[in-house]
Structure formats: C-alpha cells, structure tokens
Amino acid sequence: MPSLKDLRNRITSVKATQKITKAMQMVAAAKLRRAQNAAENGRPYAERMAQVLGNLAGNLIGGVGAPRLLTGTGQDRVHLLVVCTGDRGLAGAFNSSIARLARDHANRLMADGKTVKIITIGKKGLDVLRRQFRDQIIASRDIRGNKPVDYPFAAEIADDILARFEAGEFDVATLFYSEFRSVISQIPTAQKLIPAELPTAEGAAATGAGSDAAMEFEPNEETILETLLPKNLTVQIFRALLENAASEQGARMSAMDSATRNAGEMIKKQTLIYNRTRQAMITKELIEIISGAEAL
C-alpha cells in the first residue's frame, strides 16, 4: 500500500497535469474559432472555382487541346502522395489517422507495382511515414512558422508540385488531409490533385450549382484552363491546409477536454484512497493507544 506521502505527491502531480490540459483546451478553443471561420469561408471559393473549371472542361470536345494538368500524362506508373498533418501532437488521432490513410494508399499502390513518392507537410506526418517509407519521401515541410496558414505557403507547395510534374517526376498526385466537420468529427480525406478531378456539368446541375445559360468564352476554353488550373491547384491545397488547421484545433480541444475530465476523476479516486489510508492509520494508532492504556 502506498504511503500518505506517495499519495499526496501523486495527487499534486495529477493536479498540475490537469492545469496544463485545461490551459491547452482553452487555447485550442480560442484558435478553433478563427481556424473554423477560415475553413468555412474558404470552401465556397474552392468549390465554385472547381465548378467553373468543370464547366470549361466539359466544353472541350473529346478533350482535344486540354492541358496536361487536366488530362494527366496518360500513364499511371508513378504516384505522388502529398500528406498534410500538424507539427504538434496532443491532438488525439488527428495526425495518425491522416498518416494511416496515406500509408494504406501507398501500400496498395506498391502492391500493384506502382512507384510511390511522398511529400510531407507537417512534422508528425514525417515522423510516422519515414519509419516505413524513408526512401520514398522526397521532400518535407514544417508548418509551425506558417500559422495561421496563409496563401503564399500553399502557393509554395503548389509550385513545387507543379515543377515536379512538368519535370516528369510523377503521373498522379493525391492530397491527404483532414476535412473539418465539427469539434468531434474530422474526416481523413484523399483528394486527387493531378489529373484534376473537376465536377461535371451534370453533377453541378444535380446539386443545383450548375447553370443552364449558354456561355461564350474569350479567349477560348483551352487558354483559360491553361491559366486557371495551376491557380486551382494552389486553391485546393490552401483549402486543405485550412481544413487541417481547424481539424487539428478541434481534435486537440476534444482531447484536452477528455484529459482534463480524466484527471479530475483520477484526483477524486486518489483523494478517496488517501482519506481511507489516513483514516486507517488514525484508527490503528487509536487502537494501539487504547490497548496500551488497558495493559497498564
């Protein structure tokens, strides 16, 4: 049985930990509001841009003259995985769930004889994936110095991916991130970046986002797509980073809330044990005193 001193030290240690987790919960809650607003404000622009490009692409007869960012290389041999996680832990399963999704995807590709290359955004993704894919990781970036996430940081990532694509380093690029739904719901997501997956005109009409208006484009569709597709790549990466930032703060807030409540339960349990142990010791001492008095 632990001594009273050991129990007091244990209770003091748990209380100190509880203060830390409570503070982290409050900080995450404050950051979550800003990150959530940024993610929600970025969605309409990214979705509408994809719809516009989808309408443009739908006007190309047989895909003739379409940019390579839309059609791809015509091959499916080399896949680039862009894995976005966070730099810090203590966020529940946020980082591990994204890394697991990317790892499973990479394993399936390699089992099919494909070549896999990986770019990691965030230290935690790098830490997890390099255990198995050290030779496949061709680049990595930290995001700690870029919070809150900004557009130029997304543009740097997009420019790097675009340069590697133009150099023929890969055929298909897929982005992995966590889509923010709510504080308690973040969905690990895989989105194909190259060749670009754009909504069709039929799909846009089904969701009410399309238009029946006849449109004329000046200059032609090919020229517009050639200009906008690289920008769309940056926009989609920026949106993913915003979703990731909100998901990370939501996951951390939830994890720290759970840790704070668990610490409270542990304090209650240890305090009860302490009181019972102290009461038993006092009772034992009283019995010894009474027994000694009776002996006299």
Swiss-Prot record:
GO terms for molecular function: ATP binding; proton-transporting ATP synthase activity, rotational mechanism. It comes from the Bacteria. The keyword Transport applies. Transmembrane segments: none annotated. It holds the Pfam family ATP-synt. Its main location: membrane. Coiled coil: none annotated. Produces ATP from ADP in the presence of a proton gradient across the membrane. The gamma chain is believed to be important in regulating ATPase activity and the flow of protons through the CF(0) complex. F-type ATPases have 2 components, CF(1) - the catalytic core - and CF(0) - the membrane proton channel. CF(1) has five subunits: alpha(3), beta(3), gamma(1), delta(1), epsilon(1). CF(0) has three main subunits: a, b and c. This is ATP synthase gamma chain. It comes from Methylorubrum extorquens (strain PA1) (Methylobacterium extorquens). The gene is atpG.
